[in-house]
Amino acid sequence: MIKGETIKNNSVKIVVATGIGAALFVIIGWLINIPTPIPNTSIQLQYAVLALFSALFGPLAGFLIGFIGHALKDSFLYGAPWWTWVLGSGLMGLFLGFGVKRESLTQGIFGNKEIIRFNIVQFLANVVVWGLIAPIGDILVYSEPANKVFTQGVVAGLVNALTIAVAGTLLLKLYAATRTKSGTLDKE
């Protein structure tokens, strides 16, 4: 295959994955939204799907899915996006895309070592994105009170980390189980 064709095929895959992933992000975020005791903070399963798509299609697709999906979800549900958290979802997708070795995953490899690596990356990403970037953005852009947004950020980071650790890991493990491991087929 010619190098230009590979780039074009990858671009098409990223665009298609972004469209499907963003649509799933919106639909799951709309249908499954479990409130926490902290206002404007909920358990959201779309981050598990974001983890799967980011792992399969890479950091760029992950960023676009998180950013576009969150912007659309906020627009549909609340009338306007909350841009600092929209950026946070995009950054989560970006970081999640670096948490899994795509080649291994597509070859059916997602064992304990890969699970640990993925969960370390996703936990650190949740701490940085929801514990720092989104709250600081809220303070700078929206003049929100620091104690409020840091509380929301810490709670969101913890519930998202738990959601991704359980449901995201499960989705990745199930996906890997559907792949044929290299060298497992014998000629008869």
Curated annotation (Swiss-Prot):
Pfam families per UniProt: ECF-ribofla_trS
Record's GO cellular component terms: plasma membrane
Q: Does the keyword Nucleotidyltransferase apply?
A: no
Q: Which InterPro entries match?
A: ECF_substrate-spec-like, UPF0397
Regarding the membrane, this protein is recorded as:
Multi-pass membrane protein
Q: Which UniProt keywords apply?
A: Cell membrane, Membrane, Transmembrane, Transmembrane helix
Spans through the membrane: 14-34, 48-68, 80-100, 120-140, 152-172
Task: Name where it's found.
Answer: Cell membrane
Q: What does the similarity note say?
A: Belongs to the UPF0397 family.
Q: Which HAMAP family match?
A: UPF0397 (MF_01572)
> Per its record, how is this protein called by name?
UPF0397 protein LACR_0367
Instruction: Record the organism.
Output: Lactococcus lactis subsp. cremoris (strain SK11)
